[in-house]
UniProtKB/Swiss-Prot annotation:
Modified-residue entries ((Z)-2,3-didehydrobutyrine), positions: T44
Protein's name according to its UniProt entry: Lantibiotic epidermin
Gene: epiA
Keyword Nucleotide-binding listed: no
Cross-link Lanthionine (Ser-Cys), sequence positions: S33-C37, S46-C51
Annotated Pfam families: Gallidermin (PF02052)
Keyword entries, A-Z: Antibiotic, Antimicrobial, Bacteriocin, D-amino acid, Lantibiotic, Plasmid, Thioether bond
Top-level taxon in the UniProt lineage: Bacteria
GO molecular function, one term: signaling receptor binding
Length: 52
C-alpha cells in the first residue's frame, strides 16, 4: 500500500470574487425572490398562508 501525500491547499478557503462595477440607481434588481402562498388565511405559523 502506498501513502498519498496531501496537498497543502486542501483547506484553502480564500475566495476570489469577480465583482462588476455598479451604481446605486436601482436599474437592475439586487434580489430576485418570489413568495409562495397557500390559498386561504390562517393565524398559525404552520405553513399556512401568512401572505394574506
Amino acid at each position: 500500500m502506498e501513502a498519498v501525500k496531501e496537498k497543502n491547499d486542501l483547506f484553502n478557503l480564500d475566495v476570489k470574487v469577480n465583482a462588476k462595477e455598479s451604481n446605486d440607481s436601482g436599474a437592475e434588481p439586487r434580489i430576485a425572490s418570489k413568495f409562495i402562498c397557500t390559498p386561504g388565511c390562517a393565524k398559525t405559523g404552520s405553513f399556512n398562508s401568512y401572505c394574506c
